[in-house]
């Protein structure tokens, strides 16, 4: 993986998920590849990466320090904010998956609603399906998995046998 990421001529931030071995991921990190939560602030938007990984736990958790960094940024800036997480912040409508979203999601949601004049776009993985929902000034997206997809709105574990692997392209302009 490190060799593949080194082909890029820009810095890469990787976000660990619940299946990742954090120690192994740290071995590929250097000046170009980082696990750190980085803020790429470049008007007219700002990009924040939140590490929701909790070792040996399927559910995610937001780091309060990262939330405070976002709050500090919002107190001084009005640009669009893009946030990347592994675990989704809201439920996606599949009962068995919805039990494993970010535990302290309300902290982030309340902060974003407080800054109602700011547009937020949150992109998450974990759920192996594409999902979109808008709540006031916040757009929530989940990204399909690069392997198999889970059936949308299923009450129990179910692989979608029709959809193949996927990904999401996000163009920042």
Question: What annotation goes with each model-predicted range?
Answer:
Residues 1-37, 114:
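Core catalytic region of metal-dependent phosphoesterases/phosphodiesterases
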Residues 61, 79-120, 149-151:
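Active-site-proximal segments of metal-dependent phosphoesterases and phosphodiesterases across multiple
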Residues 68, 75, 110-115, 130-173:
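Binuclear metal-dependent phosphoesterase catalytic core
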Residues 42-80, 97-107:
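Binuclear metal-dependent hydrolase catalytic cores centered on His/Asp/Glu-rich metal-binding motifs
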Residues 21-32, 55-64, 151-161:
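Acidic/histidine-rich helix-loop elements
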Residues 1-11, 100-110, 135-146:
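Short, electropositive alpha-helical surface patch
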């Amino acid at each position: 993986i490190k060799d593949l990421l080194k082909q890029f001529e820009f810095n890469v931030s990787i976000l660990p998920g619940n299946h990742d071995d954090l120690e192994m991921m740290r071995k590929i990190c250097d000046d170009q590849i980082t696990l750190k939560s980085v803020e790429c602030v470049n008007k007219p938007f700002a990009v924040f990466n939140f590490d929701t990984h909790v070792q040996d736990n399927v559910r995610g958790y937001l780091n309060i320090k990262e939330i405070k960094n976002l709050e500090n940024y919002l107190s001084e800036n009005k640009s669009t904010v893009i946030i990347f997480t592994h675990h989704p912040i809201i439920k996606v409508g599949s009962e068995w998956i919805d039990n494993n979203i970010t535990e302290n999601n309300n902290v982030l949601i309340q902060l974003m609603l407080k800054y109602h004049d700011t547009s937020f776009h949150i992109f998450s993985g974990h759920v192996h399906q594409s999902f979109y929902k808008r709540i006031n000034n916040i757009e929530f997206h989940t990204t399909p998995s690069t392997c198999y997809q889970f059936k949308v709105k299923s009450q129990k574990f179910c692989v979608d046998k029709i959809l193949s692997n996927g990904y999401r392209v996000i163009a920042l302009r």
